[in-house]
């Protein structure tokens, strides 16, 4: 009878849930390209890191192999004012503008607007969900578009969520995230 080594078996199990290094590299490269495109079109910048964040399970560091990557891209507040002044569903127009921006980089991928996000579906099965957001001037988070039911704005603060999760991970001897 063989001895059961729970620790080794659990580590193997955890490793089997993770993305390969190649997949992680592809995700990072796509994130940089998406960020660069948004920065070029909205911020007059070529930065691949400014004005964007991983959110959701990938951003919290709790994802197992995932087929969707959620990111928030910050758009200048002047754009919020422009789309908020539309008579009807400026939120939908904002997503259409973001979609058209991303199509400049990803013309051969399926890029579509849906609800609160612009989806980019890649041929390897990984989908990016890009949420455009506007930072509140008081630093209390962001508002983002909801195109449903005629359009509205919702609030979020992903930085607080990620910070709270990281705090709790530290409090649990780094056992919350593996």
Can you say where each PLM-predicted feature lies in the sequence?
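A gly/proline- and charged-residue-enriched helix-loop-helix capping module
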Residues: 90-106
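Catalytic cores of NTP-dependent nucleotidyl/adenyl transfer enzymes across multiple folds
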Residues: 22, 32, 99, 107, ...
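Generic hydrophobic/packing signal
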Residues: 73-75, 79, 102, 106
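Short secondary-structure junctions
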Residues: 45, 49, 104-113
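Histidine-centered divalent-metal-coordination microenvironment in nucleic-acid enzymes
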Residues: 57-76, 117-133
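Residue-level marker of positions within ordered structural domains that often coincide
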Residues: 39, 103, 135
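Short, low-complexity, polar/charged sequence segments that are solvent-exposed and flexible
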Residues: 71-74, 90-93, 139, 148-151
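N-terminal regions immediately upstream of nucleotidyltransferase
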Residues: 1-53, 57-66, 77-89
């Amino acid at each position: 009878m063989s001895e059961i080594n729970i620790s080794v078996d659990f580590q193997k199990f955890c490793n089997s849930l993770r993305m390969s290094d190649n997949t992680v590299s592809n995700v990072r490269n796509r994130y940089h390209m998406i960020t660069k495109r948004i920065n070029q079109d909205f911020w007059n910048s070529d930065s691949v890191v400014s004005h964007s964040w991983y959110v959701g399970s990938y951003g919290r560091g709790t994802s197992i192999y995932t087929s969707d990557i959620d990111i928030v891209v910050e758009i200048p507040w002047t754009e919020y004012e422009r789309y908020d002044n539309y008579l009807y569903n400026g939120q939908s127009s904002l997503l259409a503008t973001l979609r058209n921006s991303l199509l400049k980089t990803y013309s051969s991928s399926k890029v579509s607007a849906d609800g609160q996000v612009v989806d980019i579906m890649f041929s390897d099965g990984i989908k990016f969900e890009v949420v455009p957001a506007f930072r509140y001037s008081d630093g209390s988070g962001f508002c983002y578009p909801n195109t449903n039911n005629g359009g509205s704005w919702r609030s979020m603060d992903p930085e607080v969520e990620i910070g709270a999760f990281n705090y709790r991970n530290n409090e649990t001897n780094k056992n919350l995230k593996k």
